[in-house]
């Protein structure tokens, strides 16, 4: 199994992403339920334009973040660190992503918040179940690397 496939399978089983934005020297983090799109290597999240992180993001901004479980032992630690770009989706792109998001999280139908895409450009996946400190790396537009 290649690196991106292994990472994608794990991300598909999780549901909360943390991402951080920086604007004019100020940092802010946010958490949200996400839908992972393995084909585009992106998360889709819903968040209101009035939130601090959305206002700091504007239409598009660089981001970094994490997805992790809550294991009880070090030997079971698995998690992703990433960097990429967040942007507010519009039009048909937004409609398609919202439809997919609502299939996974039907309760979100009552939320009028816009859809945002977090495009992942670099991923580091730590998976201690494969051996302590096992890391897999993926970069957009390049072949996967293992460390």
Curated annotation (Swiss-Prot):
Secretion signal span: none
SUPFAM superfamilies in alphabetical order: FMN-binding split barrel
Transmembrane segments: none
Listed InterPro entries: Split_barrel_FMN-bd, UPF0306
Family: Belongs to the UPF0306 family.
This protein's name: UPF0306 protein YhbP
Source organism per UniProt: Salmonella arizonae (strain ATCC BAA-731 / CDC346-86 / RSK2980)
């Amino acid at each position: 199994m290649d690196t991106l496939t292994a990472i994608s399978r794990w991300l598909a089983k999780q549901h909360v992403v943390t991402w951080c934005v920086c604007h004019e020297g100020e940092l802010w983090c946010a958490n949200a339920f996400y839908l992972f799109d393995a084909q585009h290597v992106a998360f889709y999240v819903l968040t209101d334009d009035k939130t601090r992180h959305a206002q700091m993001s504007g239409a598009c901004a660089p981001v970094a973040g994490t997805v992790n479980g809550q294991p009880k032992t070090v030997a079971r630690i698995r998690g992703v660190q990433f960097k990429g770009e967040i942007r507010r989706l519009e039009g048909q792109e937004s409609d398609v992503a919202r439809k997919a998001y609502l299939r996974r999280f039907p309760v979100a139908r009552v939320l009028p918040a816009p859809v945002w895409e977090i495009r992942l450009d670099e991923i580091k996946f730590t998976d201690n179940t494969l051996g302590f400190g096992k890391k897999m790396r993926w970069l957009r537009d390049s072949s996967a690397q293992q460390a």
